[in-house]
Amino acid sequence: MPAPPRDPEQIREAHALRAAFAPFATLAELHAHADWPELARRLERLLACVRTAVPDAAAPARETSAGLRVVHWNIEHGNRFDAIAAALGAHAELREADVITLNEVDLGMARSGDRDVAGELANALGLHSVWAPLFLESTRGRDDDLLTAVGTDNTESLFGLAVLSRWPVTGARLVPLPGPEQTLFERERMTGRFVALVCTIAHPVTPFVTATVHLEVHRTRAHRAAQMRVLLDTLAHETGPVLLTGDWNTHTFDRGERHSVLAAAGPLLAWPGGALARRLLHPDAGPARELLFDALRAAGFEWAPYGDHAPTLGMRFSRLGEVHAMPGPLRALASRGLAWVERRSRLRLDWIAARGFDATGASGRTVPGLDGPGRASDHAPIVATLQLPPG
């Protein structure tokens, strides 16, 4: 069957909660209000809605001995849906994927055409799908979103994660993670929580688990590591192969602290280009490394066989809250220098890691030409070939 029908009651509740949250400038004010306990229960019910779908026409079966082709992509909400669908369906390096994990996936947002992005993509590709919400969006979008928005308001107003699979998904669960909800509410007008989506894939020879997680971007390396450790603790009991993907926001900087802007300015402005590139493209190594990789290694996960350390995102200072917080004259003065920094600041944020797979002959690649302004997404997709152990 195609994606489940849109639920009018869910849409009404989303609009009611958006209206209820709108008067509050801070999360503390919202939480202090007498209505918050009931609003929190309603929000929890809304965000517990996990959508699953079976395709109208399943993708052709593949030889079970063939390597597993895995694609991960942060699709920037699905704003440029047609370009994303075309790439996943026809691009030489992306088509015929066995598993596709997606971050930043809308349900009923004006910026992405008011679509069920995951459900429509999965049905077009002949794949099974699971989608889970992270946040209720209170606006029609930010930054470049309004360039692609349809003229009407949002419907469900939800934003989340998805797993698409050639084989049925026999179980899906959400793993709650610690997160900077205050920052997201006050800066981006999003209300919700961070979760990881964990799915059991019914491969005909060797069933395996696929998890995807979008880690936070506004805080420190330690905070991202704490999020990852919670997920890894949940996955520790899995005895079969585990695939773990996501936009882990491994930019190597500690944001949200008093001196974070100055601490970042030194490397971005003064380091030689080669040294800066090594830091930003190899965030799993060196003194500024993201601590989440230490946690992954301790939990038995590998990522080096499945990636190439190429950039997956170009830094865009126009989207950073720290830049918007500058006084106008200072921001104008800094703009020329920031443009220079953007050109040399390419980030490796997206990853495929695995435990319990045979890494012999594994490969990973970042797919060029699909990311950047006006293209399918702001992130590049990544693809890996893995070998399942015999059943």
Predicted regions and their residues:
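Active-site environment of divalent metal-dependent phosphoester hydrolases
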Residues: 78-80, 107-110, 137-140, 182, ...
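Stable alpha-helical elements in mature extracytoplasmic
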Residues: 80, 84, 114-117, 121, ...
